């Protein structure tokens, strides 16, 4: 099993991009391994497929950005089905759980993610970031 010291969780949003850059700078400084994760959640197969396609685009861009910075970024794309419309906060918890599961699986030292996601309208810490910070067993760096 491959081990990554850094796991950067991104959705391609402004804050996600800040997290990507921060994670790559740390990776380059310490010459360590990094993986980028995108969690595609959908209640219908077509919706999930759309989000998986977006995730592939986002992760390909992250790999290109990493290459331009001299960092090799590995991609993790996770597709999750939700059978019905989730209640408030359920989607954030599902995304956070997928990030945390990947962190455990790959024995990650530090998770890096944006303070708000693409769907966040609250100026406070984003719901996914908050869930990850609360439940992570490893260090979490939140980019703002």
PLM regions and their residue ranges:
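Charged helix-capping and loop-helix junction motifs
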Residues: 52-54, 58, 93-97, 125-129
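Structural motif
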Residues: 5, 109-110
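Active-site charged/polar residues at nucleotide-handling catalytic sites that mediate phosphoryl
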Residues: 30, 102, 106-107
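Small/aliphatic-rich secondary-structure junction motif
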Residues: 1-53, 67-71, 75-76
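Glycine-rich, Arg-bearing micro-motifs that act as flexible, cationic patches
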Residues: 110-131
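Short secondary-structure boundary segments
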Residues: 38, 114-116, 144
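Charged docking surfaces used in two-component/phosphorelay signaling
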Residues: 78-98
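Short, structured coil segments at secondary-structure junctions
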Residues: 30, 128, 135-137
């Amino acid at each position: 099993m491959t081990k990554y010291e850094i796991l950067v969780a991104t959705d391609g949003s402004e804050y996600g991009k800040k997290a990507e850059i921060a994670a790559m700078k740390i990776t380059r400084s310490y010459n360590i391994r990094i993986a980028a994760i995108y969690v595609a959640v959908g209640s219908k197969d077509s919706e999930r497929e759309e989000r998986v396609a977006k995730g592939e685009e986002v992760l390909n861009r992250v790999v290109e950005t990493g290459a331009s910075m001299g960092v090799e970024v590995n991609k993790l794309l996770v597709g999750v089905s939700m059978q019905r419309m989730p209640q408030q906060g359920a989607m954030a918890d599902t995304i956070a759980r997928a990030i945390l599961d990947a962190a455990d699986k790959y024995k990650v030292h530090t998770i890096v993610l944006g303070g708000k996601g693409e769907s966040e309208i609250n100026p406070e810490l984003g719901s996914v970031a908050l869930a990850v910070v609360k439940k992570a067993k490893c260090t979490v760096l939140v980019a703002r």
